[in-house]
């Protein structure tokens, strides 16, 4: 079966997480992703957070499935020639270098366009044009500058970063959409273009409900926030609101049976208006269905702490799964707090391909996420990440069409090996 992006070739200069997230997704959809790595070193994550000595880390393997690896010293004259030929043969170049690195390599946008006018150059940077555009950015910096940290946590505590990698992986997913869009536009124009995604922009895009609340705050208190019911005045910026729901339906994380010893014995419970009467029956408060202090959503807002306190009395008598089973019968929205251990052991996620077991030649079998996007006519098969430089000769011969003699010349030039250190005199 033909893959959705079969025939698209990606020149992958990305490293760590944001860029590899993007190119891995494209590879899952069938693109031929050629990962260009430094000879002898490769992507820095190969050696970070290693759980098995001298073996590619899970950090690397789980972000680089379905790719091919070529090692190339782009400072070497022969290496530059090889890179030029790769640019001619590829559709997209993806990079997440620091600002200006591609230019210093000798391949600015203008030169790439001269080599291949159809080339799409896609870049991830920390910030867009402005006062911070030259600053180095990592995941948590992006969360802090994009509005996530200031609105995450509890009102009386520090700003918090989230466990979800919304800065790195989130921006990588945004860039992947930009690349596919540019490829589609190229079918009409015949021309390449630049695609950029800033990590600050990506985080802010995912925090849009907080930007919504910032504007609402100018017109009055945010009544669905628990501090409204507590009589605590609002300041001039959106506050941290703990586990209050960010939507129009109030929600909280509540204790379940066993919470004293199990750090994940909790459930998220949403008091959705259409099922309010069912909620009242389940928790044993039938009079709340008609009591004017509780019957209508607006009347409940100042009393959310009391209401969720009463609901929690009920959830604490049930395990999170027992509570979920009961609530689902009444169409009451809820969800158990699942630990990573529980998720990893969930067989249903393996059946859907959300989790996949991958066999690696040096580290053996490991568990990874699969493609979260399912296409009916282009099912994704997850294959292992490449060893460093594993496909170098294959790419030189198959993609660039070099002869054995030419490949030998490139090897002899040192373009595929770590730079030699000059001996001390």
Curated annotation (Swiss-Prot):
Binding site for substrate: 247-249
Keyword Transferase recorded: yes
Molecular function per GO: formyl-CoA transferase activity
Gene Ontology biological process: oxalate catabolic process
EC number: 2.8.3.16
Highest taxon, organism lineage: Bacteria
Listed pathway(s): Metabolic intermediate degradation; oxalate degradation; CO(2) and formate from oxalate: step 1/2
Residues holding CoA: 17-18, 38, 72-75, 96-98, 104, 136-139
Catalytic residues identified in the record: 168
Keywords for the protein's UniProt record, in alphabetical order: Transferase
Keyword check for Cell membrane: no
Reactions performed catalytically: formyl-CoA + oxalate = oxalyl-CoA + formate
NCBIfam families with a match to the protein in the record: oxalate_frc, PRK05398.1
Physiological role: Involved in the catabolism of oxalate and in the adapatation to low pH via the induction of the oxalate-dependent acid tolerance response (ATR). Catalyzes the transfer of the CoA moiety from formyl-CoA to oxalate.
Protein name (record): Formyl-CoA:oxalate CoA-transferase
Organism: Bradyrhizobium sp. (strain BTAi1 / ATCC BAA-1182)
Gene: frc
